[in-house]
């Protein structure tokens, strides 16, 4: 198990994403949280969703407008939006090879794809909007 990426909210809350390199048949939480009282917890998603992430969270980005945090799972082609206070799943969106993530300042997020796409995830949680398709390969960083 290794910590791959993290982000820190304005209030000091930390959310981090893991990579689990154990046996494929084992399952482990892939997201953890350190709150402002220094309480550490791992966020548990349902087993089917956790398995679909294929043991890897790539990027983490807090919204600077809402109480949400977005995490990307490129191996599972997923973007998850979580309530940063309680860790509850707000949205589970399909996005191919979702890699980098960053808040856009309006309550939404920008997400890059390892396939060259740059997407916007709007605050209304509609299907991610393709902003650009480029002849390049994004990795896990947009900052």
Spell out what each predicted region is.
Residues 1-4, 27, 56, 75, ...:
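Beta-rich catalytic cores
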Residues 28-37:
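Beta-propeller blade signature
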Residues 22-29, 72-76:
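Short, solvent-exposed loop/turn segments at conserved positions within beta-propeller repeat blades
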Residues 6, 60, 101, 142-143:
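Hydrophobic core register within WD40 beta-propeller blades
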Residues 11-13, 65-67, 106-108:
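Short coil/turn segments that connect the beta-strands within blades of beta-propeller domains
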Residues 1, 47-52, 94-100, 134-138:
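Short coil/turn segments at the loop-to-beta-strand junctions that recur within blades
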Residues 111-143:
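Blade-level signature of beta-propeller repeat domains, shared across WD40, Kelch, NHL, RCC1
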Residues 15-17, 71, 111:
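Residue position within the beta-strands of beta-propeller blades
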């Amino acid at each position: 198990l290794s910590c791959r990426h993290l982000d820190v909210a304005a209030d000091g809350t930390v959310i981090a994403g893991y990579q689990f390199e154990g046996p494929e048949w084992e399952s482990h939480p892939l997201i953890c949280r350190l709150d402002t009282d220094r309480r550490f917890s791992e966020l548990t998603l349902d087993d089917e969703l956790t398995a679909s992430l294929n043991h890897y969270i790539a990027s983490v980005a807090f919204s600077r407008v809402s109480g949400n945090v977005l995490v990307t799972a490129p191996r599972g082609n997923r973007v998850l939006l979580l309530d940063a206070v309680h860790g509850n799943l707000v949205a589970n969106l399909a996005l191919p090879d979702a890699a980098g993530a960053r808040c856009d300042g309006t309550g939404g997020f920008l997400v890059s794809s390892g396939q060259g796409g740059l997407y916007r995830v709007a605050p209304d949680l509609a299907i991610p909007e393709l902003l650009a398709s480029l002849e390049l390969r994004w990795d896990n960083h947009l900052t």
